[in-house]
Each structure stands twice: as structure tokens, then as C-alpha cells.
């Protein structure tokens, strides 16, 4: 079939070398590496294929902007989301007094969330691999003294991932280890960003051009939150899944959701899926989960059996726990009075407050332009419908007060806690979509650090007209969700070993951000890709010895 897609019946007949659940930065990269080594790989993807040539795919704009009429009904909106590579899963947030239902802006389709990401791909600091020492008051956080791998062990995999994803940018002046990354240069700063860069340097700070997995073709809009139309976004769909199926014999099952793993005491025997034609039972030597830090733990917890009464690979009772998502506050500034910036501008990184006065906070970086007002007015439900009725007024207010500035994201590391978690849902939503249940609260240590961090940012941008858009308290901000199946040395306090294999199962691996034992304060994409290459090499050497 086109683009490597395989018939469901044929997929059931084959005994695969590796079944990879999810095609994002972790699954796509690992599957590509194994396929390139000659392994028979099957990708399972819950969402639609958005590979080139698939009809109906929405590119170059968010679906709320591209198909406004379709998005005003529930059915039309969900269909448009799926065709735009967006998740239709419902999230039930039980953190407050009353449960809240919403849909996160997460990827679903070939490439997963990498197809929507802002393309920032930079290495973690060496200190991120020994995190606990940088927090004065971790309280009851489970943040470890160290990851089970070191920066030095990750170094060659970082370099390989940077090459695979075509990363361009400048080294961070505050990070000696960044200077060793031989990255091609990114384009020069835009005029608006250069004004801010000059101001920051004048304050004695150290801005740099963010490393971006982008080819910067003429007309590049650095597509964030939607699919790229001109093939300059280097995501796992373009750089890994497509070559895996087109050149290296991998196969792809889309619109196919893994619902349960069947296992004995030591091995996963079947991956049970719901597909367009019904229930499938797929078999393989190795099973790799990369469905994201919400879906992966939910899948394990929903795989309870007599052999695994608490959920698969959950002897520690840590599956689903230690949920982290980064605490991100947005600040919009206007560096030049009377000037408006509407062009793509995701360029600046600043880490002067990453490690500051003996404490760890996070990064400040360009966020890109404000989302279109249609995100508010074009959707199902009473509020979008009401806003649509007064659309000219809403648009005027939005354009006047919320648009035209440079948006900076103050992204602070949050710590892992056992009570922040993903839980099994009681069942699907009313519309038969997958429902995920989560619980997350900001702990006192994070509240204290966030207060200090945001104070520094406000002081930094004091000379400019500014608008504090906040955001850190909003549990819908899940783009960097991680930590729910952490790796570590001790099976009592981790789910996976140092090679990302489940402590209790011989053939089960997890390579999405679930494995993070701490969230660091930077974008996770490059670390996920680098680690996936590392784990793929381990699987190839140990599970398929020559």
C-alpha cells in the first residue's frame, strides 16, 4: 500500500522483529534505526497518516483557521483535528474540586507531536543529568541524584540526532558542552529579534540563536502547532518514518490504537489494537512503547491481568506517577514603540537564569507569534459560538491588545512527585474517543521558584511595553509532558532500566518522554531522539545478536 501502509490481516500474520507503538520523536527515530539495520519493523499509529500525498491532510495552518465552518460542529472539528495531525483524545483533569474535560494541543498521526512542534532541538546541560543537587528545597519530590546515563554517554547520540534531524543554530555561550556541537548556522536574527538581542547583550546577558530542526526554505514560517506545507520542518514523520517505510522495508498501520498488552511473567506476547476493521492481535519479538507520556502509562495500567494485577510492568507502583509538564509563562513585549511584528520570529534562547544563585530555574526563549484569534472563535461549544457572533469585536480587541509583539516563554523545570500522575479512565468519552485521566498540582517548591523566576523575567523586560500572559498554572499546557515511566537503577523506584527496558519484562521498551526521571528546563525533543538512537543500538545488539 502507499507510504508503507500494510493491510491489517497481513499485519496479524507476520511475526515482527519490533512493534513500535507511536511514531513521534521516540518511536519514529527508534523504528527508523532498527529498520535501517535490517529489522522487520511495524509502526502502529493511533492517528491518521499525514505523509506526503495523503488526501485531505490540513497543512500550512491550524484547522480552526483552515476549515472554520467544519470546526463549528463536534464531528467536523474532530475530523479536522485528525486531518491536521492533532489528537482527538479527551483528557479528564481530576486535580481540582470538579473534574474538567478538555483536549490538549498534542500530536496524533505520523510524526506524533513532532509534526506540530516548534523545532527547537538542543542538548540538555551536563548538569541536567545530576538534577537533585540544584534544588534547595525538593521536599517530597522524587527527583533523583542522577540519571542512569551521563551526558558523556549521551554525547555521541546527541551528535547523531542533530545530523539526522538537520539541526541548525548557535552554541549557547553559557554551555561549554554546546560548543562541541558542529551545527550549521541558522539564518540571522530578524530585525525585531535583533533589537531584543542587542538589548540583552547590553545588559551583560548571553542570548543565542536556538538550535532548530529546520531547513529554512524560502518562505519558511517555522510552522508551530500545525503541519508544514513545504517540507522544511524536520520531524520524525519526514526524517524517520517516511524513509523507514520507503527505503528500509518498515510498515505502517494508521488509525490503529493499541488498547492492551498481553503478557506472561517475562514477555509481552501480543499487542491488542482497535483498528478500522476491528480488533487485531499483533505479535513481535520486541515491543516498544512510544505513544507519549499520557498514553503509554495508561496503556500499561489498562493491561491488568491475573499475572499483572496492578498493570503491566508496574511492580513498583510507579507507572503513571511522577508526571511533569514544565511550568511555562508567556510574556509578550514590544521592543520598538509603534512597531508590530507578525512574521515568524522563534529565534532567541537565553539561559542566564537556568542555574542562578545556586538554584535551578529554566530557560527563556522565543515562543513565536500569538495563535490566531480563530482558535477562540472557530470551534464547537457555546463559548466559541458566542465569540463567533461578535467576531469583529473580538478580532479588533485581539489585534489591538494581544498581537504584534514578540512572545517570550519562561520555561521552568518542574519536579516529579508521586501524586502527580496519569490514571486509568473508567471508559471512553461519549463520542467513543480515548479518554485519559490525569492529576497534577504545583507543589510549594515550584511555586517558590516560579515566583523568583518570573520576577527576574519581568525585571528583564521592564523597559518595554509588555503583557504577562501567564500560563504555568494551566494544566492544559501538556506539550512537554514527561516522567510517567521513569528509568533508573532500582526496580523499586523506577519502571525501566538504564536501557529503557522494563525491569520486569524482557522484551518491552519505552522511548517517549515517559522515561525522563526529571524534566530539565529545556525542550525535550533532541534528548528523546538521541536516546531512541541509543536504545535502538542496544536492541539491535542484544535482542538480535548476529
Question: Language model features by range: what are they?
Answer:
Residues 88-113, 117, 121-123, 128-131, ...:
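FAD cofactor-binding and catalytic pocket of flavoenzymes
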Residues 36, 40-64, 247, 256, ...:
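Glycine-rich loop(s) and the adjacent beta-strand/alpha-helix scaffold that form part
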Residues 12, 26, 291-292, 315, ...:
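Secondary-structure capping and boundary motifs in well-ordered enzyme cores
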Residues 23, 233, 269, 312, ...:
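Alpha-helix N-cap/helix-initiation motif
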Residues 69, 73-87, 93, 97-103, ...:
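Conserved redox-cofactor binding core of oxidoreductases
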Residues 2-138, 143, 148, 152, ...:
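N-terminal glycine-rich phosphate/pyrophosphate-binding loop and immediately adjacent elements
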Amino acid at each position: 500500500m502507499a507510504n508503507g501502509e500494510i493491510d491489517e490481516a497481513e499485519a496479524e500474520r507476520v511475526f515482527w522483529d519490533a512493534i513500535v507503538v507511536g511514531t513521534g520523536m521516540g518511536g519514529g527515530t527508534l523504528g527508523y534505526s532498527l529498520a535501517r539495520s535490517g529489522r522487520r519493523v511495524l509502526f502502529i499509529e493511533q492517528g491518521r497518516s499525514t505523509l506526503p500525498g495523503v488526501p485531505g491532510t490540513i497543512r500550512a495552518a491550524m484547522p480552526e483557521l483552515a476549515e472554520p465552518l467544519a470546526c463549528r460542529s463536534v464531528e467536523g472539528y474532530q475530523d479536522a483535528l485528525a486531518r491536521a495531525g492533532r489528537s482527538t483524545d479527551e483528557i479528564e483533569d481530576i486535580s481540582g474540586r470538579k473534574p474538567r474535560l478538555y483536549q490538549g494541543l498534542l500530536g496524533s498521526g505520523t510524526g506524533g507531536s513532532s509534526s506540530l512542534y516548534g523545532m527547537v532541538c538542543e542538548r540538555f546541560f551536563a548538569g541536567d543529568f545530576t538534577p537533585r543537587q540544584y534544588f534547595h528545597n525538593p521536599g517530597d519530590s522524587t527527583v533523583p541524584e542522577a540519571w542512569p546515563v551521563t551526558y558523556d554517554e549521551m554525547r555521541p547520540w546527541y551528535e547523531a540526532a542533530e545530523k539526522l534531524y538537520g539541526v541548525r543554530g548557535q552554541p549557547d555561550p553559557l554551555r561549554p558542552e554546546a560548543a562541541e556541537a558542529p551545527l550549521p548556522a541558522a539564518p540571522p536574527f530578524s530585525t525585531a529579534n535583533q533589537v531584543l538581542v542587542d538589548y540583552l547583550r547590553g545588559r551583560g546577558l548571553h542570548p543565542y540563536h536556538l538550535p532548530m530542526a529546520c531547513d529554512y526554505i524560502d518562505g519558511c514560517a517555522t510552522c508551530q502547532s500545525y503541519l508544514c506545507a513545504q517540507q522544511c520542518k524536520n520531524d520524525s514523520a519526514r526524517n524517520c518514518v517516511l524513509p523507514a517505510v520507503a527505503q528500509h522495508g518498515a510498515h505502517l498501520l494508521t488509525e490503529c490504537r493499541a488498547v492492551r498488552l498481553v503478557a506472561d511473567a517475562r514477555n509481552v506476547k501480543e499487542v491488542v489494537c482497535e483498528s478500522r476493521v476491528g480488533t487485531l492481535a499483533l505479535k513481535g519479538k520486541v515491543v516498544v512503547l512510544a505513544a507519549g507520556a499520557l498514553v503509554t502509562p495508561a496503556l500499561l495500567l489498562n493491561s491488568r491481568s491475573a499475572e499483572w494485577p496492578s498493570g503491566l510492568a508496574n511492580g513498583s507502583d510507579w507507572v503513571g506517577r511522577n508526571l511533569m509538564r514544565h511550568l511555562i509563562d508567556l510574556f509578550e513585549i514590544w521592543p520598538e514603540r509603534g512597531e508590530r511584528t507578525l512574521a515568524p520570529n522563534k529565534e532567541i534562547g537565553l539561559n542566564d537564569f537556568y542555574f542562578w544563585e545556586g538554584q535551578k530555574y529554566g530557560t527563556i526563549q522565543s515562543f513565536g507569534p500569538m495563535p490566531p484569534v480563530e482558535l477562540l472563535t472557530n470551534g464547537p461549544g457555546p463559548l466559541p459560538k458566542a465569540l463567533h457572533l461578535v467576531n469583529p469585536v473580538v478580532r479588533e480587541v485581539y489585534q489591538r491588545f494581544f498581537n504584534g509583539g514578540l512572545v517570550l516563554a519562561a520555561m521552568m523545570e518542574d519536579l516529579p512527585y508521586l501524586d502527580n500522575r496519569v490514571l486509568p479512565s473508567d471508559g471512553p468519552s461519549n463520542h467513543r474517543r480515548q479518554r485519559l485521566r490525569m492529576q497534577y498540582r504545583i507543589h510549594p517548591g515550584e511555586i517558590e521558584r516560579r515566583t523568583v523566576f518570573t520576577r527576574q523575567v519581568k525585571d528583564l523586560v521592564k523597559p518595554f511595553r509588555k503583557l504577562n500572559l501567564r500560563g504555568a498554572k494551566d494544566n492544559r499546557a501538556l506539550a512537554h509532558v514527561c516522567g510517567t515511566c521513569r528509568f533508573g537503577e532500582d526496580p523499586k523506584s523506577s519502571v525501566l532500566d538504564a536501557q529503557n527496558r522494563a525491569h520486569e519484562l524482557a522484551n518491552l521498551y519505552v522511548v517517549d518522554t515517559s522515561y525522563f526521571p526529571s524534566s530539565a528546563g529545556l525542550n525535550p525533543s533532541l534528548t528523546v531522539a538521541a536516546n531512541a538512537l541509543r536504545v535502538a543500538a542496544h536492541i539491535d545488539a542484544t535482542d538480535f545478536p548476529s
